[in-house]
Amino acid sequence: AKEGLAENSFLTGDIMVDTVKNNLEIALSKSTIIQDLQVANEEYNLLTLHRNYNVDDTNILEHLLNELGESGEKIIFPVHPRTRKMIADTYSVPKNIELTDPQGYFDFIALENSAKRIITDSGGIQKEAYILKKPCITLRTETEWVETVDEKWNLLINPSEKNIASKIASFSPPENQRDVFGKNVTEKMLKIINDI
């Protein structure tokens, strides 16, 4: 209290909200990834996997790909070269899953924005999905972004569970979404800085 921190602390929201929205505008004007992959808006699910427990254990990785293959829905999977090699050396990929090279940020955010759903084990992508108003399925047993689960826009699924495809298909977030991470965050921050 002596330092005056309480009087000079302000809740503005998460700067990532503005970052995603501003970079999405750039991505939509510059990225050609949607045309390059020949996919239409909300015609595919976007998959990202990078956590050791999902990609280093060949049994879990194979299980996840087989479960996702059962959905029959098109899945775009930008895959790390090490994971791609493991997949190629171990088993075949279901026909509905298209492996692509890892994508740069603008191409990736364009893919996120056009996806029907996002399936991930990433922390940051869960939040990006929420900001972009995309249903998110997180292949983990916990999340650092509990708000996204509380708001019913993020479904946690244990990667070793069965019937993952049916759980994904039946997941439907509410129509309305609250701004749990804030809005106009940069504007609020600038106003506070200018007023100090």
Question: What role is predicted for each listed range?
Answer:
Residues 111-148:
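A donor-sugar binding/catalytic signature common to diverse glycosyltransferases
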Residues 38, 110-111:
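Structural alpha-helical scaffold elements that stabilize or flank donor/cofactor-binding regions
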Residues 137, 152-157:
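A short acidic/histidine/glycine-rich donor-binding loop in glycosyltransferase catalytic cores
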Residues 1-55:
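A nucleotide-sugar donor-handling region in carbohydrate enzymes
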Residues 96-104:
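Active-site donor-binding acidic/aromatic loop of nucleotide-activated sugar
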Residues 23, 155-196:
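Leloir-type glycosyltransferase catalytic cores
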Residues 45-94:
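Oxyanion-binding "anion nests"
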Residues 107:
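Short acidic active-site motifs
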